[in-house]
UniProtKB/Swiss-Prot annotation:
Pfam families: G-alpha. The gene is GPA1. Keywords: Abscisic acid signaling pathway, Cell membrane, GTP-binding, Hydrolase, Lipoprotein, Magnesium, Membrane, Metal-binding, Myristate, Nucleotide-binding, Palmitate, Transducer. This is Guanine nucleotide-binding protein alpha-1 subunit. A lipid is attached at C5 (S-palmitoyl cysteine). Residues 214-223 are annotated as: G3 motif. Residues 185-193 are annotated as: G2 motif. CDD domains: G-alpha. It comes from Arabidopsis thaliana (Mouse-ear cress). GO terms for cellular component: endoplasmic reticulum membrane; heterotrimeric G-protein complex; peroxisome; plasma membrane; plasmodesma. G proteins are composed of 3 units; alpha, beta and gamma. The alpha chain contains the guanine nucleotide binding site. Interacts with RGS1, THF1, the pirin protein PRN1, GTG1 and GTG2. Binds to GCR1. May interact with ADT3. No interactions with RACK1A, RACK1B or RACK1C. Interacts with PLDALPHA1. Interacts with CAND2/PMTR1. Residues 40-53 are annotated as: G1 motif. More abundant in roots and/or leaves.
Amino acid sequence: MGLLCSRSRHHTEDTDENTQAAEIERRIEQEAKAEKHIRKLLLLGAGESGKSTIFKQIKLLFQTGFDEGELKSYVPVIHANVYQTIKLLHDGTKEFAQNETDSAKYMLSSESIAIGEKLSEIGGRLDYPRLTKDIAEGIETLWKDPAIQETCARGNELQVPDCTKYLMENLKRLSDINYIPTKEDVLYARVRTTGVVEIQFSPVGENKKSGEVYRLFDVGGQRNERRKWIHLFEGVTAVIFCAAISEYDQTLFEDEQKNRMMETKELFDWVLKQPCFEKTSFMLFLNKFDIFEKKVLDVPLNVCEWFRDYQPVSSGKQEIEHAYEFVKKKFEELYYQNTAPDRVDRVFKIYRTTALDQKLVKKTFKLVDETLRRRNLLEAGLL
């Protein structure tokens, strides 16, 4: 009797194990099948190109966005951005006051000098204190000093971030004791991407049957981060390359002798030459157009070596469009130097973008989705 019970128990255990093994195998097969239908997108670009802002927009647009815990995690980041920015402006003002022939306009008031020294010391720390109302009032006083405003106008020479004005105009709210960052604050927050981050989404919603599912990879743009891209190159459906077209008069954070636009040109050329991208589609985002359209009327495009042959033709909106089309053509020429014009297995599209403009980013990704779906249908012989 005991032997029969033992055999029955072993038989039941074997059956359970077989059932579990079959279930695991079924899940693995399902995941492998689902994985085949996920399109891989690689988000590339030099440092400060705005690609990480694009990445955050995708999370807001096509996923659940940021929960309260994630929003709160940006508080120290945003406060650090404030301290770093005001230190850059203060130290830059001191440098201009010492070295410029018209140094008088860079002379701080006695009140600003005292505030500035304290803030510069805080900005040089490894750990920043939480932004308080008292500190924010000091920062606001310093920010409004005419000498700081003169320095800010030369921000391209000092690595002053694009978010400076936004941060300074929101100091009161950012320093509130109960402050929780808004979605807009998170988009403006500057954190250098290190390593690789990824997100999975569908531009048409959660229902995977209604459209393509994409896995988007964002990688560090600074030079020392680029070696981490290599293992991501295989099996990519498309490269989304971000080029900050407003940065034609700026230098790299990591190499102040190198023009940012020249770095972007060389990086784009290098990526195009990679054998693993021979049949990969390229979506070029000419980003930061909002800054470009203001800057190009004041700072000649031909200050950049790549744009030496640019000739202005007009003023106002007409000149902005002329300058934009010139830059666009330069990138097109670079692409076709690396790709035969009659290639049909490699799609190339250019989009004018502003990473902070959510409506524009949404519209752009819908267009990218349509382009890639059409390519898939062509490859399948359905078009």
